[in-house]
Amino acid sequence: MLLVRNSTLGRLSSLRGFFRNINESNIFYRMVHHKVTIIGSGPAAHTAAIYLARAEIKPTLYEGFMANGIAAGGQLTTTTEIENFPGFPDGLTGSELMDRMKAQSIKFGTDVITETVSKVDLSSRPFKFWTEFNEDQEPETTDAIILSTGASAKRLHLPGEETYWQQGISACAVCDGAVPIFRNKPLAVIGGGDSACEEAQFLTKYGSKVYMLVRKDHLRASQIMQRRAEQNEKIEILYNHVTLEAKGDGKYLNALKVKNVKTNEEYDLPVNGLFYAIGHTPATNIVAGQVDLDEAGYVKTVPGSTLTNVPGVFAAGDVQDARYRQAITSAGSGCMAALDAEKYITELE
């Protein structure tokens, strides 16, 4: 007889071809109930886990298996060097930071499960949820959920982009702009909204010149942001331009193949950095239609808290933050979510 939690049953069943003695008759699964379930794997998720575990509310954290196409640890795992997270004067990689956070949450008693929560039912209490390996099985249940599923930067997936991702191409100027490979070098920003203007302005602190590649013949940004970009001597706005390819020496980016859609002229633009500023996609599919979302798909929370419109469901990190999107702010909101969830659980008892 094999006794497993029901979240593991689907995975074992999928391995039946490798283990001939595994069949439905000798697998007995048990329903699992949690006090607090954290969905996510970034700074918000692990900070929430640390606080809850230290409060003796043993949380379960589903970190996912390549959830939303990103390894456990979230977007930070795609960042080569982090120099602005307090406490690390020598810097460290995003993966190193997340490994330390995960080790700390496990140390205090968090149950970390490497499966992706693919479905939730918030219509009754306790809440129900399923993972991608057990959607046809009985669900697990939980008294509270902390959503910290993050948001992924929109990318163009240009030819050459994978080669030079984090070797000249980034989706966060604030995170990566100060990296040595960008200092005193020509840089480019793709986008025409407020975020693109803000990132271009920020990058002028480090780059010798910043090109804004704008697909249309005008900026979408607010008037004040447009004016600041247009009046900055280090920013050159290339209207009616699209990017066709990322080029380099095999190690680092050194040019973009661009096209003027008005004249059809194609040419190589020498730059050592490309920053996407075309928006983010919050990972809210599993709660769409159950939790209130804003127009961009981010989870709405009560100002000054992590409470959603569903009592017992909390949101932390980039999934509810369209503005800051930093590791430190995500960690802070994870702490808030833990405290909010702890209060909720205490009141239930």
Swiss-Prot record:
Disulfide bonds join 172-175. GO terms for molecular function: thioredoxin-disulfide reductase (NADPH) activity. Keywords: Disulfide bond, FAD, Flavoprotein, Mitochondrion, NADP, Oxidoreductase, Redox-active center, Transit peptide. It catalyses: [thioredoxin]-dithiol + NADP(+) = [thioredoxin]-disulfide + NADPH + H(+). Transmembrane segments: none annotated. InterPro entries: FAD/NAD-bd_sf, FAD/NAD-binding_dom, Ferredoxin-NADP_redctase_2, Pyr_nucl-diS_OxRdtase_2_AS, Thioredox_Rdtase. Residues 1-30 form a transit peptide. Its EC number is 1.8.1.9. It is found in: Mitochondrion. It is an enzyme of class 1 (oxidoreductase). Binds 1 FAD per subunit. One of its GO terms (cellular component) is mitochondrion. The keyword NADP applies. GO terms for biological process: removal of superoxide radicals. Homodimer. PANTHER family: THIOREDOXIN REDUCTASE 1-RELATED-RELATED. Belongs to the class-II pyridine nucleotide-disulfide oxidoreductase family. The active site is a redox-active disulfide bond. This is Thioredoxin reductase, mitochondrial.
